[in-house]
């Protein structure tokens, strides 16, 4: 689906929370490709350099982006939107693959799913950590590349055309523009997204 070529999070050598590093990852075209889709899983393949600690319980903190491009005209902190969640693992001189879905990393998956389905293409790494004068913060990480692969289905319904059932995509007119409908059905009193 898309790749990004590097981002940092955390603090180094006496950094205050206000100067904690911000990593911006732009996945060109992801927003347009995923808008209105029903995402089933998101796989992140993350390559990290040997920065910070080699802990296997390091946390990457993923946030929404306030800009859907790399905006070099603003401070890094201005790029940081709402926190979506964390991913725990070893992010030190390695490549690791993490799959997010409804049963694995469910909270982060739900947040990223909604974010990408809304047409967004940029992820931000930011944890607001501070550091001592001589070292790294506990979750300092430098991601040198990140690739996302997304499994999704189109938002479709079935309609009857004479005696034949056909798969249909439903659209409606909103303020002069066509918008795709996301279908739901009622199951025992609860609305379930198709």
In which residue ranges do the predicted regions lie?
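A short beta-strand-loop element at or near the start of a globular domain
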Residues: 1-50
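Predominantly extracellular/luminal cell-surface or secreted proteins
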Residues: 2, 27, 47, 60-69, ...
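Hydrophobic beta-strand residues in large extracellular and virion-surface proteins
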Residues: 24-27, 39-46, 60-63, 98-100, ...
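Generic structural motif
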Residues: 29-33, 47-51, 65-68, 103, ...
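Intrinsically disordered, compositionally biased repeat/linker segments
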Residues: 152-194
């Amino acid at each position: 689906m898309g790749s990004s070529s590097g981002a940092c999070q955390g603090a180094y050598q006496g950094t205050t929370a206000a100067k904690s590093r911000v990593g911006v990852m732009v996945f060109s075209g992801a927003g347009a490709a995923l808008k209105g889709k029903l995402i089933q899983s998101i796989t992140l393949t993350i390559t990290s350099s040997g920065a910070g600690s080699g802990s296997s319980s390091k946390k990457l903190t993923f946030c929404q982006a306030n800009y859907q491009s790399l905006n070099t005209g603003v401070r890094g902190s201005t790029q940081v939107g709402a926190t979506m969640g964390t991913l725990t693992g070893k992010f030190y001189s390695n490549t690791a693959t993490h799959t997010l879905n409804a049963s694995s990393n469910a909270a982060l998956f739900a947040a990223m799913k909604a974010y990408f389905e809304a047409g967004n293409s940029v992820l931000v790494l930011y944890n607001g950590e501070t550091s001592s004068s001589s070292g790294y913060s506990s979750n300092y990480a430098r991601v040198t590349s990140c690739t996302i692969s997304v499994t999704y289905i189109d938002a479709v319904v079935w309609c009857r055309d004479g005696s034949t059932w056909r798969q249909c995509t439903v659209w409606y007119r909103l303020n002069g523009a066509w918008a795709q409908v996301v279908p739901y059905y009622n199951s025992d009193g609860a609305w379930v997204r198709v």
